[in-house]
Amino acid sequence: MVSIKTRLSGIELDNPIIPASGTFAFGEEFKSLYDLNILGSISFKGTTVEERPGNALPRIAECPGGMLNSVGLQNPGVKKVVEEELPRLGKFFKKPLVANISGFSLEDFAVLSEEMDKVENVGILEVNISCPNVSHGGMAFGTDAKSVEAVCKVVKEKTKKPVYMKLSPNVTDITEMARAAESGGADGLSLINTVLGMRIDIKRRKPVLANKVGGYSGPGIFPIAVRAVYAVHQAVKLPLIGMGGISRAEDVLEMMMAGASAVEVGAENLVNPRVCEEIITELPILCERLGIEDIQDIIGII
């Protein structure tokens, strides 16, 4: 009997599949498609202190190998998320959640961490220091090692829950940021966030996104993500959530062999809303075919 169970900082997951923040909202749109309780967890919509309307339209554009997005962290703000969205989500999803938080100052991260620490069905805090959609805030933290460490320390002071820092690929050396997070007391890391990109409409002679640049995601960034996970796994002794272009069961095994203990599936949810269900069904079959009895045995074997 193949086991596809895995663990993140003492939390056991039935499988390593987690829909990524920003592509699954609060699960409401997906619950009619399949039983969401088959998922390992859900990383719900990125939350800020105050409500954010997001960036101007257009803010999503298809491109070869994936998509560009510049949504701009649209969300109702932490108060509404904690008081309305999470209780609603808890009615149909009975497992610990991954709370994705994003701040524009150390004070923001402190407030968000304190609020999420009170929520019983939040299992892990995923700290977004790398969002490329916002012109002020996230990138400044995620591209400077001292800032990464400082944010991590602030969050750790305000919560007893495991803290996973979400790293940006838009840096010279992602392992430097990983080590900084480890020094700050991180319990784990999530990587990678989207890769900065841009497309131009040659007829209109204007960028396709109103914000001009956005985050590139989808299968096109998968090799970049695998390399980053591998490098970070060699550099630090922390559990990793791997993400970036995952669209099939084979990708999950590849990412785990590189060093991830679990994975997040992002852009593919927008292409195929049942992709997570399909991967969970296929994963044990693929493991059996490859002679893998316990999926945790392959973590970081490369």
Give the positions of each predicted feature.
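N-terminal capping/small domains of soluble enzymes
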Residues: 1-97, 102-104, 279
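Short donor-sugar binding/catalytic loops of nucleotide-sugar-dependent glycosyltransferases
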Residues: 246
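Hydrophobic faces of well-ordered beta-strands that scaffold small-molecule active sites
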Residues: 17-20, 40-44, 97-101, 125-127, ...
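Phosphate-coordinating loops and pocket residues in cytosolic domains that bind phosphorylated ligands
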Residues: 35, 257, 300
